């Protein structure tokens, strides 16, 4: 009888004790709320100045072709233009949006409505239940897709890249909030099953790192090492723009990790090493996949056999080569790619951007700006300042170029 009682009560006691320990641990070690370690995003700057990749004059001519496009208004194109030219750019053309005007488009609902049209749905809405700032995402069936955000958190990532402080006012149709609330919403909604997480990681690295371990709105803990696992898990080509924004997210996260003290770091050494190994393997593949002319195609993950790809369009070659050169400019020092690989790619981009026809350039403005930014990074030059310097260097250059054209509304990165 006693043994029967013991068999019944002992497991119950063990269970109750375990639950008590768990509850004590949960109460004694609550999940920390998300906090922002700084008011301004991290500045992740270049360190190269290689005229062999692109000369000053060549850079001017490339940037001259990549000035902000005129009407019709397209959120994706304006976001890429802001990312390339920055919030302080001003052009000698009243029909061309300046940097401040482009920034206002993303920060002020009235300015957005004036440019996008009074019947256009707002870009942001504030959830009355939790205060989250909701961004209108791209939907293939929407008649307003050209004025939507094309990639999850791409606006936040661009605001971070262009140095927008967290206390910057964000004026919506539902009232005024700030960029901190936009970032807080993005981090609350961040989870490991997101279809696109690259811009979320870039935003996290610039605004939030080294914070780690907060709970998202689904009750899941968000850990930086799990974000790294997502970045390196998928095949190389997976994701927007041939998987190349995943590589951008990796170099930005590594650079953010370099800017904090060892005691502050939350990125595990093994996670950083996994990213380094991944990037090192990609650089090896790029060395094998680069064409004799200097470009890459979407087949680059195949290595040497990618050189056999004869079907790639000029637009795709510029997209891939520009994105590759862009993230390569920010890799950790001991992962720097072979110099001749970078020079050949840079010189090919210079020729390609100058020779591409106007219609192709306008239709692919978004990805082509990555080529311009990449070339600027390899010269450690601010794009707007490089263009201004080029005007005096090439006095007979046109100060206005291109004409307003009706563009397709297919989303392009």
Residue spans for each PLM region:
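Preference for long, amphipathic alpha-helical scaffolds in soluble/luminal domains
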Residues: 4-413
